Amino acid sequence: ILIPILIVTSLIKDSNQKPAIKIKDNEIITSVPNCSEPTIKIDKIRNIKLLDNVEIGNKQVGYKEDKCYAGYFDTQFGTCFIYINPNIHSYIYFETKDDKCLINYESEEKTKELYETIKNI
């Protein structure tokens, strides 16, 4: 009886959490409810671009809500790890050795600030 109660309590707690992104110790850390927290080492980023328009296709694996897409999705760049609010039309695209990534932040202005921060580290 105790195990199911703990599982339900954990799911309720996780469902109330909001997606978040932060930079800490030269890493981009994404946090999505009920998902692992992937980290991207900033010194491994190459080919970084700030974009106004991106075509997002089907979800391969991940999370898709009205205000947050996170996981692997088809894009105009191929399959990318994305962490975006689809209602914000400013995106940071970059590549690492293993992945193509697409992220944005709370607003177009905050996304541009995040881009400048990443670019200058």
Give, region by region, the residue ranges found by the protein language model.
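Short, structured coil/loop segments at alpha-helix boundaries
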Residues: I1, P33-N34, S107
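Alpha-helical transmembrane spans
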Residues: I1-K18
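Alpha-helical transmembrane signal-anchor/signal-peptide segments
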Residues: D14-I28
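Short, flexible active-site loop motifs that bind/organize anionic cofactors or intermediates
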Residues: K18, C35, C101
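Generic structural detector for well-ordered beta-strands
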Residues: K22, I29-S31, T39-K41, L102-N104
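Non-transmembrane, membrane-adjacent beta-strand/coil modules in membrane-associated proteins
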Residues: S31-K97
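Non-cytosolic head/periplasmic domains of membrane-anchored proteins
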Residues: I92-I121
